[in-house]
Swiss-Prot record:
Stated role: Hydrolyzes ATP, and can also hydrolyze GTP with lower efficiency. Has lower affinity for GTP.
Entry protein name: Obg-like ATPase 1
Family, per entry: Belongs to the TRAFAC class OBG-HflX-like GTPase superfamily. OBG GTPase family. YchF/OLA1 subfamily.
Record note on quaternary structure: Monomer.
Length: 396
């Protein structure tokens, strides 16, 4: 039975954020809340984790493998010579303080580090420890969220005012009709962010033209945010802490739809020093589990990233692409010749491959697809690209 041809996918709408796949997610929060400890555990690196503000001056950056059972299955099946998973780029950014947008602490430098990131792990402290000072004097994660929220908004306010001043001179007083639509959109952004004191991402109905303008400026408050609550090991295991409900209520009211993930930096740090067997035994005894994999996967998805697989005895590899990527551009991730000479993508769904067991069986079951240049690649697709070169037709 010949492979089936499928219809081209629907038109994709633009996404707020930087286009590309080398995207970063930054760990943001006040000083002394466990950011560097979390970064060390997440990346298994040894960034300084001292007990004083601003111990992280230059942002530490690391690549973290994205856990995926599908990748592990393909590696076990093919037993390849090379295994390359997808990676999440994580940046540990020094603690912000109240007044950072006005230059307090090392505020301007830190805010520029956030600007270079594409998403935010907003870390907050919900544990008491007399040995670890809190920059605000006491533990109150809801207050801490408000501080970070306002500092990011104030920095965007500066950018919006400066942009509008420039646009008004050219588009309004100068009569440049080409820039008038951008001026009108920025006026709407000003109303939302400055007058109504919201974050850009709180508004979910920006149209395509508005998103194009937002992506020109890449405001801090447009970046996707995941809220991470750092608990004591005791509170995390028993799933009880007086701040959990208060934080969830704040997020539901102010940033609806955003994810809130409780974790314990101390627990994760302790688990890191254990063997796999000791770790499993400890977690079973405590009737709890690590959430690091969940945090990594959530951060990767928040950047609007996904991946397809190429798989065989030589290599199993996850290729990172932006959601909505068409087949020729996905092929170009492997080699520019694949995109230039693209003929088709031969696609298997992972679940079909796992169920049928072999490529031949997938074909025999009529589940093997030939896709054209308008096909939108889906997360977990297993793809073989056919392409032309000046010499001959090739296949990977």
């Amino acid at each position: 039975m010949p492979p089936k041809k499928a219809d081209d996918g629907p038109k994709q709408h633009p996404i707020i954020g930087r286009f590309g796949t080398s995207l970063k997610i930054g760990i943001v929060g006040l000083p002394n809340i466990g950011k560097s400890t979390f970064f060390n555990v997440l990346t298994k690196s040894q960034a300084a984790a001292e007990n004083f503000p601003f111990c992280t001056i230059n942002p530490n950056e690391s690549r973290v493998p994205v856990p995926d059972d599908r990748f592990e299955f393909l590696c076990e099946h093919h037993k390849p010579a090379s295994k390359v998973p997808a990676f999440l780029n994580v940046v540990d950014i020094a603690g912000l303080v109240k007044g950072a947008s006005a230059g307090q602490g090392l505020g301007n430098a830190f805010l520029s580090h956030i600007s270079a990131c594409d998403g935010i792990f907003h870390l907050m402290r919900a544990f008491d420890d007399d040995d670890i000072i809190h920059v605000e004097g006491n533990v109150n994660p809801v207050r801490d969220i408000e501080i970070i929220r306002e500092e990011l908004r104030l920095k965007d306010e500066e950018m919006i005012i400066a942009a509008l001043d420039k646009l008004e001179k050219v588009a309004v007083r100068g009569g440049d009709k080409k820039l008038k639509p951008e001026y009108d959109i920025m006026c709407k952004v000003k109303t939302w962010v400055i007058d109504e004191k919201n974050h850009v991402r709180y508004y979910h109905d920006w149209n395509d033209k508005e998103i194009d303008v937002l992506n020109k400026y890449l405001f801090l408050t447009s970046k996707p945010m995941i809220y991470l609550i750092n608990l004591s090991e005791k509170d995390y295991i028993r799933k009880k802490n007086k701040w959990l409900i208060k934080i969830k209520e704040w997020v539901d009211k102010n940033d609806p739809g955003a994810l809130v993930i409780p974790f314990s930096g101390v627990l994760e740090l302790n688990l890191q020093d254990m063997s796999d067997e000791e770790k499993q035994k400890y977690l079973e005894e405590k009737m709890t589990q690590s959430v690091l994999s969940k945090i990594i996967k959530t951060g990767y998805a928040a950047l609007q990233l996904e991946y397809f697989f190429t798989a065989g005895p030589d290599e199993v590899r996850a290729w990172t692409i932006k959601k909505g990527t068409k087949a020729p551009q996905a092929a170009g991730k492997i080699h520019t010749d694949f995109e230039k000479g693209f003929i088709m993508a031969e696609v298997m769904k992972f679940d079909d491959f796992k169920e049928e067991g072999t490529e031949a069986s997938v074909k025999a079951a009529g589940k093997y697809r030939q896709q054209g240049r308008n096909y939108t690649v889906e997360d977990g697709d297993i793809i073989f690209f056919k392409f032309n070169t000046p010499q001959q037709s090739k296949k990977k």
